[in-house]
């Protein structure tokens, strides 16, 4: 135990380790807050669809040789979130079908672009890093940490300020509309916010694993709590703890950051499921 603490203390002296912890915790917090709403609205896989769009946007940025791809990826992902929301309201194309269509199409086209216009000698490595997150935590820069911090504060502020409206839209959208709540506006706000979170999480866990950050903490919290506020708080705490623990384990074991965080999330879900079966906390 002493050796582990000494090793962690040694690593803590390096800025990139602190950057990874800060970014991981912030992304986990934002993902969990939105995850509860998305799971309850049965729109969990919007994260999966938009993450593949973000992957496609990164492929376009690579083809155009854009060094700072964040603005382009952010714009394309937000536009796709808006279009996905509008398409999901179409009676001819249901929400799940629209997400599946967008997800598979974006993934196929982006990989095709990366093959046809490859600007890297290590295409498979680039694709793996984008899909599953960076295998090294050395990739985070100070500017990325600050950008993540600012956007994370904005996401949390939106959720806190609009909590009552989001709660109403989540549980009974028709009733919310009947009492004058602009449900479409808040659905749009949720879609844009999740798009921002997905772009932020790309470097940490990769496009294929982002949905895990959104879904697992929410499902784990729902196993032990029934109250919306309690579920939201529990999901946030669980997500932050799992992210921090996953990053620390990846540092000590030398494993990929994103995959390790998701593995810890899965373990937490199994524990919460066990507590639920034993008749644990239900408030």
Task: Give, region by region, the residue ranges found by the protein language model.
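Hydrophobic alpha-helical transmembrane segments
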Residues: 21-25, 70-75, 97-101, 145-150, ...
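Helix-loop-helix "hairpin" substructures at the membrane interface of multi-pass membrane proteins
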Residues: 140-217
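Cytosolic-side transmembrane-helix boundaries in multi-pass membrane proteins
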Residues: 255-262, 266-283
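Short loop segments and helix-boundary regions at transmembrane helix junctions
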Residues: 36-121, 221-233, 250-254, 277-278
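Transmembrane alpha-helical segments in multi-pass inner-membrane proteins
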Residues: 203-259
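Structural signature of hydrophobic alpha-helical transmembrane segments
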Residues: 16-28, 67-78, 149, 199-212, ...
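Membrane-interfacial amphipathic/re-entrant helices at transmembrane-helix boundaries
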Residues: 1-29, 283
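Transmembrane helix-bundle core of multi-pass membrane transporters
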Residues: 4-10, 99, 103-160
């Amino acid at each position: 135990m002493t050796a582990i603490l000494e090793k962690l203390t040694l690593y803590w002296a390096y800025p990139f380790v602190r950057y990874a912890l800060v970014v991981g915790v912030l992304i986990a917090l934002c993902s969990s807050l939105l995850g509860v709403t998305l799971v309850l609205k049965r729109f969990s896989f919007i994260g999966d669809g938009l993450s593949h769009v973000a992957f496609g946007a990164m492929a376009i940025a690579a083809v155009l040789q854009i060094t700072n791809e964040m603005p382009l990826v952010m714009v394309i992902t937000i536009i796709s979130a808006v279009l996905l929301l509008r398409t999901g309201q179409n009676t001819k194309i249901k929400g799940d079908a629209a997400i599946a269509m967008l997800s598979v199409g974006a993934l196929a086209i982006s990989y095709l672009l990366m093959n046809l216009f490859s600007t890297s000698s290590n295409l498979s490595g680039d694709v793996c890093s984008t899909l599953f997150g960076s295998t090294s935590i050395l990739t985070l820069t100070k500017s990325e940490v600050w950008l993540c911090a600012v956007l994370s504060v904005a996401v949390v502020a939106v959720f806190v300020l609009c909590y009552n409206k989001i709660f109403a839209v989540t549980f009974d959208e028709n009733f919310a509309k009947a009492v004058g709540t602009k449900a479409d506006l808040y659905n749009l706000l949720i879609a844009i916010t999740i798009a921002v979170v997905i772009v932020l999480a790309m470097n940490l866990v990769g496009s294929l694993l982002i949905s895990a950050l959104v879904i697992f903490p929410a499902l784990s919290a729902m196993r032990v709590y029934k109250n919306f506020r309690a579920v939201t708080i529990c999901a946030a705490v669980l997500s932050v703890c799992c992210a921090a623990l996953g990053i620390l384990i990846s540092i000590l074991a030398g494993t990929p950051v994103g995959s390790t965080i998701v593995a810890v999330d899965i373990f937490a879900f199994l524990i919460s499921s066990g507590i639920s079966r034993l008749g644990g906390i239900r408030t």
